[in-house]
Design a protein with these regions (language model features):
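Aromatic (Trp/Tyr) and acidic
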Residues: 1-103
C-alpha cells in the first residue's frame, strides 16, 4: 500500500544520507564515516560544522547519468562545493523527516 511504500522510501532516503550509499559516506559531519571535506582551490580554508549536512552525491562532471562524490582535489575539480558544502535546508528537512517518523 502507499503508506508502507512511503515509509520504506523515507527509511531508504535517511539511511542514504547517514552513509548507506555507494560511497560509504555519511553526509552528516561528525556522524558515521568518510565525511566529505569542503575544499576550495586546494585550500581547506572553510570547515564543515558537526551536524551539518552537505549537498552530497550528485551527477558526474561529464555524465549526468552517473553519480559522483568529490572528496578531495583532483585535476578536473578545483573546488567541491557541489558535493561538500553544507546547507541549512538540508538539516531542516532531515530533522523534520526524523521528527515525523513513527519508530
Amino acid at each position: 500500500n502507499l503508506k508502507n511504500d512511503l515509509e520504506e522510501m523515507s527509511t531508504f532516503t535517511l539511511d542514504w544520507i547517514m552513509g548507506q550509499n555507494p560511497f560509504d559516506s555519511s553526509m552528516i559531519e561528525g556522524f558515521g564515516r568518510n565525511n566529505p571535506e569542503y575544499f576550495f582551490f586546494n585550500n581547506y580554508d572553510y570547515v564543515n560544522i558537526p551536524g551539518g549536512i552537505v549537498n552530497g552525491i550528485t551527477s558526474m562532471i561529464d555524465d549526468e547519468e552517473g553519480i559522483d562524490l568529490v572528496m578531495e582535489p583532483r585535476s578536473d575539480v578545483s573546488d567541491n562545493w557541489r558535493w561538500a558544502e553544507q546547507w541549512i535546508p538540508h538539516v531542516s528537512w532531515f530533522m523534520f523527516a526524523k521528527c515525523i517518523r513513527k519508530e
